Regions:
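Arginine/glycine-rich "motif VI" loop of SF2 helicases in the C-terminal RecA-like domain
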Residues: 78-82
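Short S/T/G/P-rich N-terminal loop/turn motif that feeds into the first structured element of a domain
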Residues: 1-50, 57-67, 83-107
C-alpha cells in the first residue's frame, strides 16, 4: 500500500479554491484503478497549512493519477495561483495493523 502525503500552504484568498478543485477531482480520482481513499486535514500548529493523505494499492496507480489530464490542469492552477508552498511525499507502507475495541472504532 502506498501513501501520498501532500502538504500545502495556499495563498489565504485561494484556500477555498483548493477545496473546490479537490471536490471537482474526487469523482475522477475514484475512477482510478488502485485508488483506496483520501482525507484532508488542517494543521493546528502551522496556520493555513493543509494536508491531503491518499492511499493507493500500487505505485502504478499513483502514476496513473499523476498523469491524468484533469489532475495536471489542477496542478498548473495550483502552482500558478493557489499555493505559496507545497511538498509531496510518497511512501510504501512498512506495517499496517490496528486495534478495534468497538466495531465502529478504527485506528
Amino acid at each position: 500500500m502506498i501513501a501520498v502525503i501532500f502538504e500545502a500552504i495556499p495563498v489565504p484568498e485561494q484556500k477555498n479554491r483548493y477545496f473546490e478543485l479537490a471536490g471537482q477531482l474526487k469523482s475522477e480520482l475514484m475512477r482510478i484503478e488502485g485508488f483506496i481513499s483520501v482525507e484532508r486535514f488542517q494543521s493546528i500548529t502551522t496556520e493555513g497549512k493543509i494536508l491531503s493523505l491518499s492511499w493507493w494499492e500500487t505505485e502504478e496507480a499513483v502514476k496513473n493519477w499523476k498523469k491524468h489530464f484533469m489532475h495536471i490542469e489542477a496542478q498548473v492552477e495550483g502552482q500558478q495561483t493557489i499555493f505559496s508552498h507545497y511538498r509531496i511525499r510518497i511512501a510504501n507502507t512498512l506495517k499496517d495493523y490496528s486495534f478495534n475495541k468497538e466495531d465502529n472504532f478504527n485506528v
